[in-house]
């Protein structure tokens, strides 16, 4: 068993839970009640669900990798998931830093949850 992948999978599923519970309260509910036109509002709602699914599937994939460590495909899939979470974190950092907010790194702190998954997955793949 690969402990790094196990930790990454558990962390990713924790991130998914925070996204689903916190995101529903802090993002989805306000989005659905705002004055935005219905079509873009529903597209953003669907995108939120897509991210929820993606986070859960990534966590499950990492848990699976923790049990199958040593097979030839394990490293490639783990590096893909690590890159995936790095890209998510980078997207939040770029958006946050481009707005010009004071103390921007704490305004959208999602990157803080995403980077550990990437680091743990990369450590398991190395």
Where are each of the predicted segments found?
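Juxtamembrane boundary at the C-terminal end of a transmembrane helix
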Residues: 3, 64-68, 119-126
């Amino acid at each position: 068993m690969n402990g790094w992948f196990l930790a990454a999978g558990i962390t990713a599923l924790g991130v998914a839970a925070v996204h689903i519970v916190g995101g529903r309260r802090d993002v989805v509910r306000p989005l659905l009640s705002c004055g935005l036109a219905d079509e873009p509002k529903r597209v953003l709602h669907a995108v939120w669900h897509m991210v929820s699914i993606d986070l859960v599937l990534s966590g499950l994939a990492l848990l699976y990798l923790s049990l199958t460590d040593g097979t030839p495909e394990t490293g490639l899939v783990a590096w893909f998931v690590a890159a995936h979470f790095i890209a998510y974190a980078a997207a939040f950092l770029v958006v946050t830093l481009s707005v010009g907010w004071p103390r921007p790194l704490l305004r959208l702190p999602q990157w803080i949850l995403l980077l550990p998954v990437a680091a743990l997955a990369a450590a398991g793949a190395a």
